[in-house]
């Protein structure tokens, strides 16, 4: 248990930041799932629309340190490749 006033404050701040980050990660995952679901359904337009929404979110969270920049790049690359394959097949 924290003894100093500063340590108590840091505990409160850490918990507040954790809850904030959990909410942001959840939102990011939801957008990724929407894009993946549109690809799975074969809906090229919805997939492109969802991809356009998720890219700035991934970039923003990578720059803020919520996720690693390579993870953001990996998600973008894989989604982009799947959408490209879907649009050429259609």
From Swiss-Prot:
Gene3D superfamilies: Ribosomal protein S20. The keyword Nucleotidyltransferase does not apply. One of its GO terms (cellular component) is small ribosomal subunit. InterPro entries: Ribosomal_bS20 (IPR002583), Ribosomal_bS20_sf (IPR036510). The keyword Ligase does not apply. SUPFAM superfamilies: Ribosomal protein S20 (SSF46992). One of its GO terms (molecular function) is structural constituent of ribosome. Signal peptide: none annotated. Keywords: Ribonucleoprotein, Ribosomal protein, RNA-binding, rRNA-binding. One of its GO terms (biological process) is translation. Belongs to the bacterial ribosomal protein bS20 family. Binds directly to 16S ribosomal RNA. This is Small ribosomal subunit protein bS20. It comes from Francisella philomiragia subsp. philomiragia (strain ATCC 25017 / CCUG 19701 / FSC 153 / O#319-036). The lineage of its organism: Bacteria, Pseudomonadati, Pseudomonadota, Gammaproteobacteria, Thiotrichales. The gene is rpsT.
